[in-house]
Amino acid sequence: MRKRILLASCLCVLAVTSCTIPDNKGQIWNIGVPDSSTVELALGPDRYKDFLANDFGFEDRYFLVGKSDVKKSFPYVLPGPADQWGGTWSTAGLRTHDVNILFGLENIPEEGEWSLIVDLADNSPHKPPLLKVLINNSQEEKIQLTSGGSDASITGDMSQAKPIHLSIPVKKGVLREGGNSITLSVLEGSWLLFDHVGLQGPSRVRLVNPEKAFVRSVEAADYEVATDSGNKQPLLVDVEHLEGQPALAVELDGKEIFSTVLDTARYCLEVPMPAVASSQISTFEVRADGKLLQKGKVERKPQPLQTFARYVDTRIGTAHSRWMIAPGPWMPFGMVKLSPDNQNAGWQAGYQPTFESVGCFSHIHEWTMGGLGMMPTNGPLQTIVGDETDPDSGYRSRIDKLTEEAPLGYYKVDLTDYGIRAELTATTHCGFQRYTFPSDKDSARVLVDLHIPAEYDYQLEDVEIKKVSDTRIEGY
């Protein structure tokens, strides 16, 4: 059942250069120098307490290969939720941080292997971090590091450090022409120190040279919007402004259909393509001040009409929050508020998005009120929910985060320890849950837990449950 990768410490040995442009040996890009030192990275080698003051760790902060300055934009340290200096505190909740790397590829050869290289100078010896690597929101790896060398490493004394070299194969089809992203996060434990991060791949690959704007992604929307000139299927253009005020233009099949002036920050543009009655392939080009940023092909086909409600993701705002703030299919003023729970009891109990497990799905999420948890399981019977930091404890299950969906009125996730898909929805007075069990595992069951971890503890003074039939139970 354990999905983590346990790595022994080893000395980092890499025969690569320190430049940020591709060479003829398959090194596509590098951040830092693989020399077991942190001095060339931002805040290195000892200013870890300035991490928050320099706005590192937030989801909108990034390092853009070919544009960003490694000494200013890539921190030498990444705190974990166990680090007070990283923002975690008893009254502030857990704080997790990300390091985001953006890069553009002009071409993807049909043949050739890719590897992401992460060289760590050291990590916490007392609370080893659980490192998560996410590539283009489609491939994720979780790596449980072993105990590091010394607490002194974070202050620049590397005499007892234990460097670690990670080589992560990138699956075929994950990288794409145009914009790509890699996110490095610490989900559990304490700090780690970066030495070098790089991408290896076919030597024929060409990097995008970012100037005034960088296109993260371009894709056709799975919906249509109504306009005065008829329905449109948006072409979703995700672009970062870099400098100046470039004029962005989008062409479809050789005709300009959209233009705007970029000013600051990130734009997620809905470029209106005329809706079609049947599937067809079109070509697009995205330009900034006339310079081609990205081109490609897009499939256009009939889609359902979009509503404002479909833009909602109920997970937004749930991090570091309280019991009554959670994702799920909640009706306005509903008596039933179904949601996944994954935390221990306490004021933060309920849902924390960085805990990639589920303890149960419970029905009540109001201030000072909670209860009635349900959980589909199979295999050996467990009767306690288990601990938030140990997904192997109790009946809780790890989840596949990439399968999680939380629009208005619906929640879905795959419980990977059991091979079960869970789906939730609700009316004002009733919750509905659908569990899809695998056919190759025995002892399938649905647990009903009346005393689950919640914001405050509570006593069950009077409980009655009776079996009405093979498919129905009733009680209070």
Predicted regions and their residues:
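Bacterial Sec-dependent signal peptides at the C-terminal "C-region" and cleavage site
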Residues: 1, 8, 12-25
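Beta-strand-rich ligand-recognition modules
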Residues: 23-111, 119-206, 253-276
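Short edge beta-strand/loop segments characteristic of extracellular beta-sandwich folds
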Residues: 104, 117-121, 233-241, 434-436
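Short proline/glycine-enriched turn/loop motifs at strand-loop junctions of beta-rich domains
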Residues: 126, 240-246, 440-441
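Short, aromatic- and glycine-rich surface loops/edge beta-strands on solvent-exposed regions
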Residues: 181-184, 250, 279-290
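Short, compositionally biased P/S/T/A/G/V-rich stretches that sit at domain boundaries
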Residues: 198-230
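Beta-strand-rich binding/interaction modules
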Residues: 244-253, 431
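Accessory carbohydrate-recognition regions in carbohydrate-active enzymes
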Residues: 264-270, 275-286, 296-476
